[in-house]
């Protein structure tokens, strides 16, 4: 189907505001830009929100814990924000974590992992894996259920969720109930049909992705590592079930769907859901109808996995 009218209007607004893509900005300006992009007035209320720092082998790691209403122990969603491993933080994805907490009736733990270029790969997946281990070990004290832990994220956060799921399989722990991969980055390559078709004009561009990867990796060879490019993993051990969500007008569409098929081939119960007429980032764009449908699908998948 053609690009949706709401999406056209959103892109026109961005173009009218000027500023160019992330690839034309300094890292500092790009970090400010994502806060504006996903800014939500009056985000949903949850039962409680707590910021804390947790000890890891690489130092203290900031996290934010969102607790839903109702009696625990609550299932846990470990959430890793998008932003090309370079931008984004607890604030940029605060509204997204709130709606997921309420819709899926789960405790959401958002991880403020170390960003590139100050901290290159594998700092981000290492932090996300350490945070997930910590959450499982400390779930009872938090009011969470260590037997019902999922990972999820959008874009580069979806990449990190996929990486943590791979790490958990490779290392034998923790056991994960679900992986929620929202238009994930899965391969350090720019050769898919969707990258050619949607490489410019739809919010995220091919040039942006090159810029993000260049900041994230020490060198191109590092992009062949499966925890950087999950699509290149030779073996997938005990893959968790999950949902891979993609957008029709997204350069990352095909690599996300290819990874979903790879997980299916490895025996995982994976739903691949392409949203027609919409663009990269739509899960955080609350003005789009696609966001509401996607939130409902994500929540349904999480709740079903947590009920098993």
For every predicted segment, state its role.
Residues 2-25, 32-308:
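Alpha/beta-hydrolase superfamily serine-hydrolase fold, recognizing
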């Amino acid at each position: 189907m053609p690009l949706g009218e709401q999406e056209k209007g959103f892109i026109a607004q961005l173009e009218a505001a000027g500023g160019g893509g992330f690839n034309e900005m300094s890292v500092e300006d790009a970090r400010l830009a994502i806060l504006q992009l996903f800014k939500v007035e009056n985000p949903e209320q949850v039962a409680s929100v707590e910021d804390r720092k947790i000890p890891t082998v690489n130092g203290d790691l900031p996290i934010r814990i969102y607790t839903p209403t109702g009696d625990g122990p609550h299932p846990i969603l470990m959430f890793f924000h998008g932003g090309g491993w370079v931008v984004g933080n607890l604030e940029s994805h605060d509204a997204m974590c709130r709606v997921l907490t309420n819709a899926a009736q789960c405790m959401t733990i958002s991880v403020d992992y170390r960003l590139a270029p100050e901290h290159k790969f594998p700092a981000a997946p290492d932090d996300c894996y350490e945070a997930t281990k910590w959450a499982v070990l400390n779930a009872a004290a938090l009011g969470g259920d260590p037997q019902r832990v999922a990972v999820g994220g959008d874009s580069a956060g979806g990449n990190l969720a996929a990486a943590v799921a791979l790490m958990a399989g490779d290392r034998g722990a923790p056991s994960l109930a679900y992986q929620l991969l929202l238009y994930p980055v899965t391969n350090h390559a720019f050769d898919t049909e969707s990258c050619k078709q949607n490489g410019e004009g739809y919010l995220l561009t091919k040039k942006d992705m090159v810029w993000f990867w260049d900041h994230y990796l020490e060198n191109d060879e590092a992009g062949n590592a499966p925890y950087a490019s999950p699509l290149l993993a030779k073996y997938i051990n005990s893959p968790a079930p999950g949902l891979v969500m993609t957008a029709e007008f997204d350069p990352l569409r095909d690599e996300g769907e290819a990874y979903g098929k790879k997980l299916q081939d490895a025996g995982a119960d994976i739903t691949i859901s392409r949203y027609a007429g919409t663009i990269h980032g739509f899960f955080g764009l609350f003005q789009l109808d696609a966001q509401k449908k996607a939130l409902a699908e994500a929540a349904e998948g999480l709740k079903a996995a947590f009920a098993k």
